[in-house]
Amino acid sequence: MKQYKTVNNLVGWITFLIAATVYCMTIEPTASFWDCPEFITTGYKLEVGHPPGAPFFMLVANLFSQFASDASTVAKMVNYMSALMSGACILFLFWSITHLVRKLVVTDENNITRGQMVTIMGSGLVGALAYTFSDTFWFSAVEGEVYAFSSLFTAVVFWLILKWEDVANEPHSDRWLILIAYLTGLSIGVHLLNLLCLPAIVLVYYYKKVPNANAKGSLLALLASGILVAAVLYGIVPGIVKVGGWFELFFVNTLGMSFNTGVIIYIILLAACLIWGIYESYTERNKARMVLSFILTIAMLGIPFYGHGTSSVVIGVIVIAALWLYLRPKTQAAVKEKFRVSARTLNTSLLCTMMIVIGYSSYALIVIRSTANTPMDQNSPEDIFTLGEYLGREQYGTRPLFYGPAFSSQVALDVKDGYCEPRIKYNGTKFIRKEKATPNEKDSYIEIPGRIEYEYAQNMLFPRMYSSAHTQQYHAWQDIKGYDVPYDKCGNMIMVNMPTQWENIKFFFSYQLNWMYWRYFMWNFAGRQNDIQGSGEIEHGNWITGIPFIDNWLVGDQSLLPQELKDNKGHNVFYCLPLLLGIIGLLWQAYRGQKGIQQFWVVFFLFFMTGIAIVLYLNQTPSQPRERDYAYAGSFYAFAIWIGMGVAGLVRLLQDYAKMKELPAAAIVSVACLFVPVQMASQTWDDHDRSDRYMARDFGQNYLMSLQESGNPIIYTNGDNDTFPVSYTHLTLPTNREV
């Protein structure tokens, strides 16, 4: 086992060096398009970017920017940060694959044969390198964006739960869980995508704690993981701001104290409750106090108070009462032992919660820097209330998920005083600082209506075609005949044509699942037609294989395309080899007995939650401003695990059907399968090598240099690709233009 650990560490670091070297060689030397210039600027100058911000990314980017020789190399340093983090992501992917394969291949941990060693290392190397050279991950690895950092968090926390699995029965194994919680809290300050790893993590925990796990228990574990995700995403993240806001209102508006007094007192009390709860659950001196301190901490974090206004308070009181009734000593003594909540469980839960809060506290940076009125100060989140709006991304609006209007739905109307009025609802209220009439006037907040939303007369389940601004695009993607619904327009009865539920589902499969997910998936593991953004046309942005008869069936004869499309650098063909390896790997894993099927469900839910679950949540409309494959990198990461396992699956096939010994079979398969990532690298290098791209920087400079040098000229920009390069050039690079 010692020899295995040495080899595993050595090959893992070699994989890291390969990936990091490739990414550092191909980084963009300056800012890229889209959000990159903004993130680089906010990192370098610690300014406030678009909601919901990325404060921990800003802090680490600022650290890397200190290595810049001058302002012109700041972007390069931040891009190096992404490259190194992406290389580290590959390292942890390698170790995750070797861990999972070892569990299925090795029967005696103290006597790992050479054949088993080669199988495990070959699996890790092929899977990790396939992901290294995949289209989506390489794209994010060479630019200053949050997705490389987020991918590293995903890789690390998944690897950590596998490390915990090895030591789960040791006395201090909970420290791995606490470290996962801390990294989860930190990841909130980068991107919320990392929370989607929690179901896979919970399954690993369940399968280790319950060796004879069954389907019912697995479903309950998944339900618990969903509650855990909701507790962080809809509990802690907005809850701390909500309860802190209540304290702020009480101390400022009621007691007449100055701004931020309530927030400071809330932070002190929250810290005190956490420490008290941890102390009581550690000492176990008084069970009633232990439960009380735990529930008080949960309440102070705002986890039970879901929603807005009075309803959130009612929900919170009900949840708190239910927790007390279940956790109180009398109830715990009456229930069966397997349903009891131990002091260790409460203590670990509170420690994990505290670490999440510590990680999440990076958002204090946003308020501090906004108060300093930095040049870029989007939404100006200077107090607890504006921070809540900033975190909630309220400027982006909402979209229906389970029930809501279709694109043709009409606003519900009510007759009032002889006039027709649209039916509207207010989502809570907002509080803003009152402008003082005199310097001696006390600080106070005033209440204003919250976000206003229209109510619609016609609604449907699972609305996928909901945007009235995209009516033509829906019809272009789907042959919509619909059905007529009567609509009373203030006494004038008209018919509204609504899409059928089946047409709605067909759009979900044809556009949202196929075009906006499956197409990206196949880019990475089958091949890509070109890098021109597609909107459904046959010659732009489709996935291909490089196998003529398949491609002819999919998108027509590619030899008939214009030469400029044939020569497009984004034309990459993998002949479906990574896809086939992944399918072999997932089948091999699923059929390796109970341990194999348990592993399969762990990897599957990592794959599902970071892929299809995001598709369901985003509910995207046609004509997106850019390709969205970067959002699903975690799903492709999970599939890379199966690609690595494909090596072990092929070794098994040679052993079973060619009657080969394990060592030669493992050596042959590992060497042969290494040609898959080599083929991927040969195809994707030219379109991912950004080492000589300066277009975004030049674009921003051209905008600024076209302005007059004095007189404070005003410039109007259109969208991300106009605004952010200009902001980067103006705020990061030295210019002589005061805009």
Q: What residue spans do the PLM features occupy?
A:
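Short hydrophobic alpha-helices at membrane interfaces in multi-pass membrane enzymes
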Residues: 118-125, 167-185, 214-227, 286-298
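Aromatic- and kink-enriched transmembrane "portal" helix at the membrane-lumen/periplasm boundary
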Residues: 24-25, 71-79, 104-117, 124-151, ...
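Transmembrane-helix signature of polytopic, membrane-embedded enzymes
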Residues: 93-133, 168-175, 595-605, 660-670
